[in-house]
Amino acid sequence: MSNIEERVKKIIIEQLGVKEEDVKSAASFVDDLGADSLDTVELVMALEEEFDTEIPDEEAEKITTVQAAIDYVSKNQ
């Protein structure tokens, strides 16, 4: 597991209060991990802070799964 993947998963676990084993690459924040719209906004803000980047709203809307978050951060580091 890459350092970025580990960091993204750690943020998801902390922000959504889910178990590590539930945070699979294909997991949807809303459908699989029980996030609501506020959770997803806070999750994006936590990713921005952790990786010292700004995620535009139109990009943030596309980050709906664990893998999408990992991919976005990996491409925009």
UniProtKB/Swiss-Prot annotation:
PROSITE patterns from the UniProt entry: CARRIER, PHOSPHOPANTETHEINE
Entry keyword set: Cytoplasm, Fatty acid biosynthesis, Fatty acid metabolism, Lipid biosynthesis, Lipid metabolism, Phosphopantetheine, Phosphoprotein
Highest taxon of the lineage: Bacteria
Subcellular location: Cytoplasm
Record's signal peptide: none
Keyword Phosphoprotein carried by entry: yes
GO CC field: cytosol; membrane
Record flagged with keyword Transmembrane helix: no
Modified residues (O-(pantetheine 4'-phosphoryl)serine): 37
A molecular-function term among this protein's GO annotations: acyl binding
Domain Carrier: 2-77
Gene3D superfamilies tied to this protein: ACP-like
Family in the record: Belongs to the acyl carrier protein (ACP) family.
Protein name: Acyl carrier protein
Organism annotation: Shewanella denitrificans (strain OS217 / ATCC BAA-1090 / DSM 15013)
